[in-house]
Amino acid sequence: GNRSQKVKLYDSTKEKVLAQTTADGDLEYGRLAKAGEVFYLQMPEKIDKIFVTTGVIKDGFGSMKASDTYYESGTGSTTYHPFSIKKRSAVEFNISAIDRNSEITYAHIEKKENGQWKRIDDTVKIKPASYDDDFVHGLTKGEYRLAIKAPTTQLNAVSYTSSSKSKKVAYKKSKAKKIKLDGQTSNIYTTGEKTSRWYKISITSTKKKRILNLGKNTVSGGYKFTIYKKGKKKAIKTIKVTGNANAKIAKMPKKKGTYYIRISKLTKKTNGTYEIGYY
């Protein structure tokens, strides 16, 4: 229903079930329920028009498919959920820990290599009642599994999307990919990819101050962006984007010419997306 009309849902103990707001402004309620449990819906005193849709989703799941949503109540132990990646891709996971009165959910990704499961990232912490917590990986073709550990009082909604990424990047300065003014480029690093990559921009006017927006979306590590002016060996700027910082701004000098941007990983575990915008 419409949020402004304040539809409320209560469980069998008459405790209010908390709602999350969907992208289109509707209210969505979710809670782990026992078979035969009764819920109560309180309608507003004044009603214009309200649509109420109810449904039951099975608790617990095994393997995963892209764009499907799964629900699982915590067991106190780690549960594993296999999935496959067919092409080099940016893979974005969304985990929502629904019960605000519960505790933290933990998650990480493992890859199957030579018959053994190998962990490829740091642990992600999903706080209670934190909806739409996203974390992104750069993954190659292969078999993977999502590991989740949640308290028995927590209910998690889990989904992922996958977007294939071309490996057509420049590993040499002489082959640097050009970024046009008011344009941007993005790609991924996987755990096995180590070589630095090169991009370039052209500053054609000294009247306006130009900037580079340097961004990342990773679970582990981060990226180093080193900026050079054509003809100069010494870098004019070095910027690291890591930790909680999703992006940093590099202010460019008011000097005409070609400038090169070299991007490199900060750690072996670094995997995920990066973005360079020129404005």
Each language-model region and where it sits:
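Non-catalytic extracellular/lumenal accessory regions of secreted precursors
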Residues: 12-24, 44-87, 160-200, 206-207
